[in-house]
Amino acid sequence: FISQGSAADSLTDIYELALQSDPTLRAARANFQVGRETKNISRAYLLPVISASADFTRTERNSESSQVYSFIQDDPFLSKSFSDTDTTSYGVSLTQAIFDMPAWYQFQSGKALSESASAQFASDQQSLILRVSSAYLNALRAFDNNETRKAEQRAIQRQLEQTQERFEVGLLPITDVHEAQAIYDDALVNSLEAQGALNIAFDALQVLTGQNHDSLSGLTDGFMAVNPEPLDSQDWVSFSLNNNYQLKVAELGKDSSYNQAKAATAQLYPKITASARYSDTDSDGTQTSYLPTESSSGVSSLSDGHSFGVSLSMPIWASGINSGRRQAKQRSIAASENFEVAKRNTAQTARSRHQLVITNTARVKARKQAITSAESARNATQAGYEVGTRNIVDVLAAQRSVFQAKRNYANARYDYIFAMMQLKEVAGQLSPDDIYQLNAWLDPSLTVAK
């Protein structure tokens, strides 16, 4: 039913809820955060590495020895000694790559992957706009279909009742009643199926928002289908080749693979690394001896030092480098070919969607005219039935044609709207503004409910 009220959810309501609750978008946002760190991770191999160390050691030592200290007596004296030493050391070291081409190309690859993550997330955001629009329009489509199916059922039921009355007074044969009954039964089945489809369409909104939605704002009768601007399909192809986000993902994947191949080749290049180190060591302790008298002395030492160096390393032979280089090269070739495929598909999709919008624009106008034609045909058939030139099957078929024309018109309008959004999506121009512009054509005073 359609009721007057303001409690209905609008398209912007659904979209804004989906921005916060859609699990697909949340997963895409997390993947974007993962991807954007790739640049930082790969850049780390070009930055200096600073490390610090600290060490504390306590050493205790006991010793005993027998010694003779008299030429007269041979009795030995027992000599004992004990030492206790604490040693503390600190160190700071720095290493910096001066020339490391594999790390440089890995950094370039990481930058491309981070940019690819941004492009993919932009594509995912456009995908949400399409999914929200599709789900909302499908709910409106299902509602219109359900309304016409119920109206069709009621109209056929009235015709069936009139046919039965005429049969009872001997004006019609029993075959007309059976034919009308068969058509009514089919209309009843269609009505039940339409109600089920309406419930399913409303439930699909819950996947996006996590909430139940029982009523929506309907599309106004004043909505007009117009041709895309610009009208030339080649302009839309150019937009798509320059702005399509999935094409950007493919291009950046190609760039990343190219730099990966360069990094694999550079494994045979020399690497130059600079290093610096500073260290400090402090030792304090005591040493006690018994000879056999006791004597004690302190032990202390302090030392520090620093070093600087530059090292060069170059692989002479390493197993697997050549295989890795060939593998990376083939991956780069594959990525380049995939990018070419994406370019061609994007251009073809832009042309086909542009043509679909133009076709749907004309289709909306034709479907609207078809309603008038179907109603005229129904009236003529009804008049022929009254004078006996047409039978009940003709009348019911004419009535069903009117309702079918109304369904076709509603479907044509929704198809046009979604086709226009798909065209903007492939051209990289779809944005939340399109949601808000479409929402302006939804009548908040009309509530579409399941």
What residue spans do the PLM features occupy?
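Sec/SRP-type N-terminal targeting helices
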Residues: 26-30, 43-44, 82-85, 98-125, ...
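A glycine-biased, small/acidic residue-tolerant capping/turn segment at secondary-structure junctions
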Residues: 375-396, 421-436
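Small/polar, glycine/serine/threonine/aspartate-rich low-complexity segments that form flexible
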Residues: 53-96, 222-230, 262, 275-316, ...
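Bacterial Sec-pathway N-terminal export signals of envelope proteins
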Residues: 5-55, 61, 213, 219-260, ...
